[in-house]
A protein has these predicted regions:
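Conserved HGGG/HGGXW glycine-rich cap/lid loop of the alpha/beta-hydrolase fold
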Residues: 12-69
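Active-site nucleophile elbow and catalytic-triad environment of alpha/beta-hydrolase enzymes
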Residues: 166-183, 198-200
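Catalytic histidine-centered segment of alpha/beta-hydrolase-like enzymes
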Residues: 222-234
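Short beta-strand/loop motif that positions the catalytic acidic residue
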Residues: 187, 193-195
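Conserved acidic catalytic loop of the alpha/beta-hydrolase fold
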Residues: 80-98
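Conserved alpha/beta-hydrolase "acid-adjacent" motif
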Residues: 200-206
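N-terminal cap/lid segment of alpha/beta-hydrolase-fold proteins
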Residues: 1-11
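Flexible "cap/lid" loop of the alpha/beta hydrolase fold
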Residues: 108-116, 122-149
């Protein structure tokens, strides 16, 4: 399915009903940089885990990714443009309130959405996310050309089928133009942070959780690339949303 949002962006998304109807708000899944709903969430079994817990799943491909439009202007990728997209999608679907589950860049956007529109967010689970600047030391005029952790990620994702390297570069510059700030934190939205014990891109997640009154779960033996498929991650989120 697609939604025509404000401006010139068309967003592709899926809307998956739960296995058994339940009285719960939908869950909006927000994927990481250079992936899409299918790669980040479906392939890791998240629709089944959440649907089996009685939760409706909303899964957009964020702008610049997957089957959604891919503008080439970095201003199109400022965090506030993403949050406007997500609020527009909720309005299109007549969904008043959601739970958020993000991973990596998707967690940054979940934080921003909870900060911008706390009345639309019940709870937020943030995976693979910490206060560290993901773009530190990277030359974003030529992403992928260096040896920073971000350059390594960019080289990997820019070569994936369906990705547009120019759009991803613009996305990186747009995100970097608004560095993450832990203060202020979302108010009135319970937060769960989940990170792999070997995740060098989400360092500081435990400290961030403590600073904003959230809860942190560490996944033994997992890094940034494989934490999202962990049963520990899925169970922690289901318990947080349903328990």
């Amino acid at each position: 399915m697609t939604a025509n949002l404000a401006g010139d962006v068309t967003m592709r998304y899926v809307d998956l009903p739960p296995s058994e109807p339940a009285d719960a708000v939908p869950v909006l899944l927000l994927h990481g940089f250079g992936t899409n709903f299918g790669m980040n969430w479906s392939a890791a079994g998240w629709p089944q885990a959440l649907g089996g817990a009685g939760l409706r799943v909303l899964g957009p491909d964020l702008r610049g990714h997957g089957g959604s439009d891919k503008p080439l202007d970095e201003a199109a990728y400022l965090p506030e443009r993403f949050t406007a997209d997500l609020l527009g999608l909720l309005d299109e679907l007549a969904v008043d309130r959601v739970d958020l589950v993000g991973y990596s860049m998707g967690s940054r956007l979940a934080w921003e959405l909870a900060l911008t529109a706390p009345d639309r967010v019940r709870r937020a689970a943030l995976g693979g996310f910490g206060p560290v600047n993901a773009f530190a030391d990277a030359d974003l005029s030529a992403p992928g050309a260096g040896d920073t952790p971000f350059d390594q990620v960019f080289r990997t994702v820019s070569g994936l089928a369906g990705n547009d390297a120019e759009a991803l570069a613009a996305c990186a510059r747009g995100q970097a133009a608004r560095p993450f700030a832990a203060d202020p934190a979302p108010v009135g939205v319970p937060l769960l942070f989940v990170s792999g014990a070997r995740d060098t891109l989400a360092t500081g997640a435990e400290d961030l959780a403590a600073r904003c009154g959230g809860t942190h779960v560490e996944i033994p033996g997992r890094d940034h690339a494989n934490a999202v498929s962990s049963r520990v991650f899925k169970q922690a989120v289901v318990d947080f949303l349903v328990g």
